[in-house]
Amino acid sequence: MKRTPTAEEREREAKKLRLLEELEDTWLPYLTPKDDEFYQQWQLKYPKLILREASSVSEELHKEVQEAFLTMHKHGCLFRDLVRIQGKDLLTPVSRILIGNPGCTYKYLNTRLFTVPWPVKGSNIKHTEAEIAAACETFLKLNDYLQIETIQALEELAAKEKANEDTVPLCMSADFPRVGMGSSYNGQDEVDIKSRAAYNVTLLNFMDPQKMPYLKEEPYFGMGKMAVSWHHDENLVDRSAVAVYSYSCEGPEEESEDDSHLEGRDPDIWHVGFKISWDIETPGLAIPLHQGDCYFMLDDLNATHQHCVLAGSQPRFSSTHRVAECSTGTLDYILQRCQLAPQNVRDDVENDDVSLKSFEPAVLKQGEEIHNEVEFEWLRQFWFQGNRYRKCTDWWCQPMAQLEALWKKMEAVTNAVLHEVKREGLPVEQRNEILTAILASLTARQNLRREWHARCQSRIARTLPADQKPECRPYWEKDDVSMPLPFDLTDIVSELRGQLLEAKP
């Protein structure tokens, strides 16, 4: 079943088409370090973008991090994601794995990634290999280092903005709203700065351009092949920073003299591209990334600007540290949500039947919404990625079994609600209130089950290795006596909708 694009997706696509139409056959200008105005433009238009060259990082940390990348690659722990973009399933050209705080997740392109946990204090984590455990510990060490560097960079940015307060241009009033760290740097700002750099996950990336001959061309500036298209990073705490450690494998690290006369960027060297969102006046930047370089996107840069990754000729790893927005994205969160639904189940029933305490519409509506959340945001997201996480750790096995057991109890709760709707003697008004409360969730459940089932059977899904093949789970056949309701809810939804229509005058 084809998903209807969201209003945000439609608006983004319309902006892109308008921009391409406006450009026609011309390229927008962009700058590289070879251009005289490159650093001036960076300072004026991209002041919240910071580059730390490899020489500023200790050799010991470089060695550990680069060995950790190779370890994760050697053990087959990086995977191309089967993502959903505008209703189409696509395999990302970049292979990834999420490492971070135990129980955290990170969602991008309608795909929820689950952390391979790093060893935070007080945790007891088992990895499948000692080398993988050591690699995760190294990325936690890198995380700590990048956090310190980010806090320092944010403090420097705040100090610069503070120093500029007294030099307000004549055309700007003193109370003109400022974008940035704020006009008064104080103790609260210090707390804010630390929270904006409190990285809880890193998304590891790997790509070998030699094995990806069909990479897209950058469409606006003519920057060449892209490993990652123009985007804002998703699912982050507002105004939080992003820190990236880049490691391109052995190859041409410097431009040769023969290339110095070429316009634009050197296609053999990896670059990160930046542009102001939907701005065709300001030149873009293409910043070369050499082995061990780090860059930082501070404050609201990720919201006001877009970035892309421009492929070089050699394989490249990166570790991208983020403050993932986890208010609805941790195991603790979803377990707490799942505890709400069973609170409506009576405990004094002797057999396996489920009896409900309340048929209040608001209570039933909340229960069905939680039912959908655990099924489609957690269980199906996890199993759609096959058994990939077992390559690194079994940390998620028990929690997923627990969530599935809670979900199964919710199926029984839904069944009890449907029995109540059919009960003879139930007042019509009360029946209609119940139907109105649950119908939207049941309709969404049916549509989403059909969509996820189709995605698992798609041609591209069938090409994946056995341990990465999507699994449509939970799934059961009609004759499965252990399940109170069918997998396919088409008939039930149709019947409920008909009852509601009949009741209307």
Curated annotation (Swiss-Prot):
2-oxoglutarate binds at N205, Y295, R316, F317, S318, T320, R322. Residues 213-224 are annotated as: Loop L1. Its cofactor is Fe(2+). The modification N6-acetyllysine is found at K216. Fe cation binds at H231, D233, H307. Residues 32-327 are annotated as: Fe2OG dioxygenase domain. It is found in: Nucleus; Nucleus speckle; Cytoplasm. Its main location: nucleus. Its EC number is 1.14.11.-, 1.14.11.53. The keyword Nucleus applies. It comes from the Eukaryota. It catalyses: a 5'-end (N(7)-methyl 5'-triphosphoguanosine)-(N(6),2'-O-dimethyladenosine) in mRNA + 2-oxoglutarate + O2 = a 5'-end (N(7)-methyl 5'-triphosphoguanosine)-(2'-O-methyladenosine) in mRNA + formaldehyde + succinate + CO2; an N(6)-methyladenosine in mRNA + 2-oxoglutarate + O2 = an adenosine in mRNA + formaldehyde + succinate + CO2; N(6)-methyladenosine in U6 snRNA + 2-oxoglutarate + O2 = adenosine in U6 snRNA + formaldehyde + succinate + CO2; a 5'-end (N(7)-methyl 5'-triphosphoguanosine)-(N(6),2'-O-dimethyladenosine) in U6 snRNA + 2-oxoglutarate + O2 = a 5'-end (N(7)-methyl 5'-triphosphoguanosine)-(2'-O-methyladenosine) in U6 snRNA + formaldehyde + succinate + CO2. Activated by ascorbate. Inhibited by N-oxalylglycine, fumarate and succinate. One of its GO terms (cellular component) is nuclear speck. Binds 1 Fe(2+) ion per subunit. It holds the Pfam family FTO_CTD. The modification Phosphothreonine is found at T4. Substrate binds at R96, Y108, H231, H232, D233, E234. RNA demethylase that mediates oxidative demethylation of different RNA species, such as mRNAs, tRNAs and snRNAs, and acts as a regulator of fat mass, adipogenesis and energy homeostasis. Specifically demethylates N(6)-methyladenosine (m6A) RNA, the most prevalent internal modification of messenger RNA (mRNA) in higher eukaryotes. M6A demethylation by FTO affects mRNA expression and stability. Also able to demethylate m6A in U6 small nuclear RNA (snRNA). Monomer. May also exist as homodimer. Belongs to the fto family. The 3D-structure of the Fe2OG dioxygenase domain is similar to that of the Fe2OG dioxygenase domain found in the bacterial DNA repair dioxygenase alkB and its mammalian orthologs, but sequence similarity is very low. As a consequence, the domain is not detected by protein signature databases. This is Alpha-ketoglutarate-dependent dioxygenase FTO.
